[in-house]
Amino acid sequence: MAHKKAGGSTRNGRDSRGKRLGVKHFGGEIISAGTIIVRQRGNKFHPGKYVGCGRDHTLFALQSGKLLFEKKGKLQRRLVSIIVE
């Protein structure tokens, strides 16, 4: 005869992998066209001059140049721009 009651099973114990989001290149860096600058969920950073925005809100360089992060406007939005040299 069993001396302990049967332990119930749990429905937890799973988790998803990290999605590798975040800033990939920082202000002042020289980057080439097509380089991914920021991977994000939603527009935490907004595209400025010579920066494109993908379907998943990924920011990427449209031209080669120096990377610039700045806050602009009444709402102090974080803009990512490229200064073409």
Swiss-Prot record:
Entry keywords, A to Z: Ribonucleoprotein, Ribosomal protein
SUPFAM superfamilies: Ribosomal L27 protein-like
Positions of region (Disordered): 1-21
Record-level GO BP terms: translation
Entry's Gene Ontology molecular function annotations: structural constituent of ribosome
A cellular component term, taken from the record's GO annotations: cytosolic large ribosomal subunit
Superkingdom classification of source: Bacteria
InterPro entries hit by this protein: Ribosomal_bL27, Ribosomal_bL27_CS
HAMAP family: Ribosomal_bL27
Protein family according to the UniProt entry: Belongs to the bacterial ribosomal protein bL27 family.
The name this protein goes by in its record: Large ribosomal subunit protein bL27
Gene coding for it: rpmA
